């Protein structure tokens, strides 16, 4: 659920997508409805051509909770302050502020705190990636280029094979009995 929720929320925050199912117009990725007037408990989020995109209180709460608790490192301080429960504030001012900040939220990446290494003037290489998966253990990944693979093949044929390990002789009950009989 944690992995799907950022995708779900980012889709909800994208521009309006009109879908029609049996003549019923929907907006906000199917979570809102296009109507002339919103009900008392609903909020107007976007415009559906000539109508209003109305969203119920559960969807509004879902979006606010995700923005408040799910993505604190992505949002700037202005948005975080706006999402905190405010007293004596007008819902119209908050809605206008949310709509003005949405393009900024959309432009920020969910991977803003991830470190990426960018190498300028890098030459493309053919590479093979090998990963081993063992349940309950750490996964190790080895990457080798085509030239490294060729060198390792040549060096493997030039070097002698490794010596076999010494045989481990474990005392067995039958051997102990035979030694005892001989004495």
From Swiss-Prot:
Region (Disordered): 141-183
Keyword Cytoplasm applies: no
Tissue/organ expression: Expressed specifically in testis.
Keywords associated with the record: Antibiotic, Antimicrobial, Defensin, Disulfide bond, Secreted, Signal
Cystine pairs: 27-53, 34-48, 38-54
Gene Ontology biological process terms in this record: defense response to bacterium
Domain of life: Eukaryota
Signal peptide start-end: 1-19
Cellular location(s): Secreted
A GO-annotated cellular component: extracellular region
Pro residues bias: start-end ranges: 159-170
Family: Belongs to the beta-defensin family.
Role of this protein: Has antibacterial activity.
Full protein name: Beta-defensin 129
Organism listed in the record: Homo sapiens
């Amino acid at each position: 659920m944690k992995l799907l929720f950022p995708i779900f929320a980012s889709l909800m925050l994208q521009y309006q997508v009109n879908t029609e199912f049996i003549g019923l117009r929907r907006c906000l990725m199917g979570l809102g409805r296009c109507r002339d007037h919103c009900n008392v408990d609903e909020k107007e989020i976007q415009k559906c051509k000539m109508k209003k995109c109305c969203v119920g209180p559960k969807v509004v709460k879902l979006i606010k909770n995700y923005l408040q608790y799910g993505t604190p490192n992505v949002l700037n301080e202005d948005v975080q302050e706006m999402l905190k429960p405010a007293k004596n504030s007008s819902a119209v001012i908050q809605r206008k502020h949310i709509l003005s900040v949405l393009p900024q939220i959309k432009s920020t990446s969910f991977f803003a705190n991830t470190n990426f290494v960018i190498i300028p003037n890098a030459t493309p290489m053919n590479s093979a990636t090998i990963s081993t998966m063992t349940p309950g253990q750490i996964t190790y990944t080895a990457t080798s280029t085509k030239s490294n693979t060729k060198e390792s093949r040549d060096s493997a044929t030039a070097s002698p094979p490794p010596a076999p390990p010494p045989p481990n002789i474990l005392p067995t009950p039958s051997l102990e009995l035979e030694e005892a009989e001989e004495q």
